[in-house]
């Protein structure tokens, strides 16, 4: 089997570090590996599978002779992804730059793997919240087409990067010392006001748009429709930042075309790849972010019918947004390309 030459862009960041961990854990096959980052991080030494690599500054020519390029995200994708694709690399991009481009497949491998090979050089990784929700939606959608989704997210501070974790830690220290909590980052760096996230909930992730939904919320709308190949699905999201380090949680109410029993949905979830059913109210068994952190599978529980609508189904789903919500999803796409020898 041919093994690809692989580049990781953003190797020194949180998602880049997760790429490296997962490549080692999953024995991802590669011929040569190149680690890339900004000029500021170039020169850093990183070890992968026992071999030390020096991180290079990312430039267009960095992608010469690269088969698969894993982009950890960020604004640099917009300029470097087309350059890498032009040089023959298949780019798997974790940024939002190309997600809604009709020429670019938006892929969750358990949900729409058939879209991977339709790429024209770039494949987009969806938003972390969309990926996690889609793993709960797909088994239900296969039983009866989804008409409407109402979702509230409980998103960990690490979704805002390591600065989000540091801000939460500092605020907890300030609060316990009786000091005023300082906030410089959340709900979003570009906002005119910032609020403490410690002992608090922030019902804003990213900037507000003209319709009073946030950019994060509208990502969930459009991306869900694209992944499930149905623009008629109504998605009504509220995204909330919570004082949790890692793993996003989501409360989801779905209306399907026909009624689906709890038993049928649970059975479908149990067979669905990447999903673990943790659902036993009598034993207080349900998914929690503390226990899904650093694991590959998402967990689904609190599965129950809508009290008033026979076509309605409620569930609670939790997943590690750095793993399945970012690095793992991208690496699974790369694994698919290797399996099909399509690079």
Segments predicted by a language model, with ranges:
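N-terminal Rossmann-like NAD(P) cofactor-binding subdomain of oxidoreductases
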Residues: 1-192, 232-234, 267, 284, ...
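General structural feature for long, well-ordered alpha-helical segments within catalytic domains
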Residues: 11, 19, 136, 197, ...
């Amino acid at each position: 089997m041919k093994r690809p030459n692989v580049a990781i862009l953003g190797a020194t960041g949180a998602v880049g570090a997760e790429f490296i961990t997962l490549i080692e854990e999953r024995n991802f096959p590669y011929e040569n590996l190149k680690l890339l980052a900004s000029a500021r991080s170039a020169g850093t030494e990183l070890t992968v599978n026992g071999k030390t690599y020096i991180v290079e500054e990312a430039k267009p020519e960095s992608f010469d002779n690269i088969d698969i390029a894993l982009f950890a995200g960020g604004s640099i994708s917009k300029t470097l992804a087309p350059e890498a694709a032009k040089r023959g690399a298949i780019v798997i991009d974790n940024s939002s730059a190309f997600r809604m481009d009709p020429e670019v497949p938006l892929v969750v491998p358990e949900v729409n793997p058939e879209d991977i090979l339709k790429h024209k050089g770039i494949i987009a990784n969806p938003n972390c919240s969309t990926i996690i929700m889609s793993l709960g939606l797909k088994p239900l959608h296969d039983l009866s087409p989804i008409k409407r989704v109402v979702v509230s997210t409980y998103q960990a501070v690490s979704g805002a990067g390591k600065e989000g974790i540091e801000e939460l830690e500092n605020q907890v220290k300030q609060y316990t010392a009786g000091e005023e909590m300082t906030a410089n980052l959340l709900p979003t760096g570009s906002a005119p006001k910032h609020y403490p996230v410690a002992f608090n909930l922030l019902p804003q992730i990213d900037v507000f748009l003209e319709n009073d939904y946030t950019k994060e919320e509208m990502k969930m709308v459009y991306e869900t429709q694209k992944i499930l190949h149905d623009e008629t699905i109504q998605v009504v999201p509220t995204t909330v930042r919570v004082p949790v380090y890692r793993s996003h949680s989501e409360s989801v109410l779905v209306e399907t075309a026909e009624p689906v029993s709890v038993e049928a949905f649970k059975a479908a979830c149990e067979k669905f790849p990447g999903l673990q059913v943790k659902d036993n109210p009598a034993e207080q068994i349900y998914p929690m972010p503390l226990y899904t952190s650093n694991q590959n599978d998402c967990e689904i529980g609190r599965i129950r019918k809508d009290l008033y609508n026979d076509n309605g189904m409620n569930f609670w789903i939790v997943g590690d947004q750095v793993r399945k919500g970012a690095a793992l999803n991208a690496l699974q796409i790369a694994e698919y390309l290797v399996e099909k020898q399509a690079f």
